[in-house]
Amino acid sequence: MPVPASWPHLPSPFLLMTLLLGRLTGVAGEDELQVIQPEKSVSVAAGESATLRCAMTSLIPVGPIMWFRGAGAGRELIYNQKEGHFPRVTTVSELTKRNNLDFSISISNITPADAGTYYCVKFRKGSPDDVEFKSGAGTELSVRAKPSAPVVSGPAVRATPEHTVSFTCESHGFSPRDITLKWFKNGNELSDFQTNVDPAGDSVSYSIHSTARVVLTRGDVHSQVICEIAHITLQGDPLRGTANLSEAIRVPPTLEVTQQPMRAENQANVTCQVSNFYPRGLQLTWLENGNVSRTETASTLIENKDGTYNWMSWLLVNTCAHRDDVVLTCQVEHDGQQAVSKSYALEISAHQKEHGSDITHEAALAPTAPLLVALLLGPKLLLVVGVSAIYICWKQKA
């Protein structure tokens, strides 16, 4: 029997079996023709070409060869030896060559959508249509597709230390289904996470979705979570997606109000130290006995090694303007949250109170002084004026 030109590329058992079948059935007639697909499965990477092998044991009956993906009424025509245009499909051997029995094909630029079972089918020439005669057992084509770069997303709103936040990781378009996903925080592997691969059944490609739960600490401004994906299609290092905890954490400030020494006896300098807060956004208001004295927005900040910030504000108080003790309050609004505050009681010394009283007393007496002078000197002035008038009149008569 004739030997397919491309058979040297086929596995030896397949070649021997085909030759044996040909010798046993070479003159037995068309019912003995065998369609041989030697490979039950073929796996290629996306973008590569896939070779699907098929050989016949006889040229009888006369008729074309066709390739289909899938079986039954919904099968898809991949190649027709007789007619049609199939730009991605080429034949491995020269089909016009005399006594050719090799009907293997190659499909270029494979994508995950090409996955499936392919059947090599022999048709018998008929009128008006050819009739299916015999089909091969089928070759399952699986496509190895790389997963997309993992995308990590954090919580929509910030949370404070000691609270738990969730991070999600997604990757799509990979095949086969087997995949490994791990979570890390600052290089330490996490254990509190759940992962799903969809769909659950067979598919041309798959997606993975994982959610990790992370407990925040005050030192997490510089921390990072990593989603790591390993897959058979990846060469070298696994794929990684990252998220910064600085986008998820809010560290509330601590307040300390103190009085600083001053050279001037009638002035007091009170400071409000706002420490270890994150993010930057902060507004501070000073109140004197509950009344707003000044409001300012933090600008020049000092950054700590852990990524948090410090800021100091001061208030200069004229103690002479107060006869009683003053309650000074430092009120801080941070990152749009409810204001926090701390108060300081500024004591007015007895000397300052007495000094303030003297000033007030003198100021109260000052307007009455001219009146007292007028009351004391008035009669004497009137007497002098009267005597002067009499003397002038007597002088004129004389």
From Swiss-Prot:
What is the protein name for this chain?
Signal-regulatory protein beta-1
Cytoplasm as UniProt keyword: no
Q: Residues of the signal sequence?
A: 1-29
Source organism per entry reads Homo sapiens
Q: Please give the residue ranges for the topological domain Cytoplasmic.
A: 393-398
Taxonomy of the source species:
Eukaryota, Metazoa, Chordata, Craniata, Vertebrata
Write down the SUPFAM superfamilies for this protein, in alphabetical order: Immunoglobulin
Subcellular location per UniProt equals: Cell membrane
Positions of glycan attachment: 244, 269, 291
